[in-house]
Amino acid sequence: SRGLGDVYKRQIVNGAQPIDQFVFHDADNDEYYMYYGGWKHCNMVRLNKDFTGLIPFEDGTIYKEVTPKDYVEGPFMFKKNGKYYFMGSEGGWTGPDYKVAYAISDSPFGPFNRIGEVLRQNFDMANGAGHHSIMHVPNSEDYYIVYHRRPAGVKTRDHRETCSEKMTFNEEGLINPVEITTEGVEA
């Protein structure tokens, strides 16, 4: 197996900037996959069980590009009711179009069908709402999105605050759009 350092050596594979690593455990086959990438490209690699190396896929490759339509950076994956939800940021992280969108597949390898936006900016409250993670309360239907944003009127690119909102699904399993609030989630 190859070492994880290979991913971090500024090696550009499939056009993916080596940033924003996210590890996903697929409980169905007890495999660990790492998704990563910026510059509008996302790769996945297969990790060994102690996370010290990469394992080739069945076809002998180490990297697979799994980029959904309009993806820019910040991959996140979760599984719900047999479907793989791939989420990522779109637009420019300092611009007015930065947002979180998602795609769904029947496989952790894709292809991922872009469904729509989950979180977008509300310029009266904040901008730069994008890069995120999802928290799921085990054995429940409670999901939360945690993300960063800049307060309204702040122009400094690195002045960000961490926020969280409840995330819900409709009857078909699609994610309902999340509204940015100043309250966050209930304690």
What is the role of each PLM region?
Residues S1-Y8:
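Short, small-residue-biased leader/transition segments that mark boundaries at the very start
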Residues I12-G15, E65-K69, D124-M125:
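Surface loop/turn motifs at the tips and blade-to-blade linkers of beta-strand repeat domains
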Residues V13, D20-V45, P75-G92, M135, ...:
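Hydrophobic core segments of beta-strands in well-ordered, beta-rich domains
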Residues H41-N48, G95-Y102, V154-S164:
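Structural motif
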Residues V45-I55, A103-G110, T168-I175:
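Short loop/turn segments immediately following beta-strands, especially the blade-tip
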Residues D70-N113, L119:
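Loop/turn-rich, solvent-exposed surfaces of beta-rich toroidal or solenoidal domains
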Residues R114-V137:
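Conserved blade-ending motifs and adjacent loop-strand segments that build the rim/top face
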Residues G153-A187:
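Beta-propeller fold recognition
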